[in-house]
Amino acid sequence: MFFAASKIFWLFVQPISLLLAGLLVSILAIALGWWRLGLAFSSITTVLLALAGFTTLGNIMLLPLEDRFTRPALPARIDGIVVLGGYMEGEINASRGGHEVNGAADRIIETMRLARHYPEARIVVSGGEGTFFEDSVPDAISTRALFRDFSLTGDRLFFEDRSRNTYENAVYSREMVKPQPGETWLLVTSAFHMPRSVGCFRQAGFPVIAWPVDYSTRPDRHFTIDLQNPLGNLTQVTIAMREWLGLAAYWFSGKIGEVLPAPGGVSVVGG
């Protein structure tokens, strides 16, 4: 229920949907002779589009998320690594085969690097079919084939392909590997996604060390006009809005213990 509701909710509140709604309302209002209302909505829509596409607003919105957890020094030893899906183009892989990756490919690249550095560590790839409207190959399934092509095999590999969201990533990963007290596990995911991910793993009773990757912000970039990359700017705003709304929804539904999880939190004993 939560999965379906979250997908439908996001369909209507993502920035492009809100901008389209504002445009349609303004057209309808003008057609009905409500000129002031139409002008107001068209003006608001134009301003929001300009802010999202032609300023560094997205960078500002993402920065607190990406800076929340910093990557520590490499531990001397670890017991395992959990990498969260979201780096594969599941719909394309379903229709064309292969294992096409997207802009979050840093997640799996860093995991493979860590796997070589820690040859005894268990590796959990957590990523099921998170799409709602189209057929998709789960990231865990595609990654199994990718690992095989790179001769990365063995009984230390675990592929969790049931999860559809971040909370299920945590719950099903914990069920699969049953981490013991005192073990050291790294959690690999995009930096902007790390606060919500760590919060979910804590709530599931799976203590992890955050290992953020896939950074997209510059700490030295303040709010300013940016005319060079409107599509990239709009994409950053969309990602940031989705993540902040996700944090609020997860906190409200009890899937994380605080609105913006921070370093030093405590895992729930027993999940």
State what each model feature region is.
Residues 223-228, 235-271:
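Extracytoplasmic/luminal low-complexity segments enriched in Pro/Gly and acidic/polar residues
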Residues 1-30:
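Membrane-embedded alpha-helical segments of integral membrane proteins
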Residues 30-38:
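Membrane-interface helix-boundary motifs at transmembrane edges
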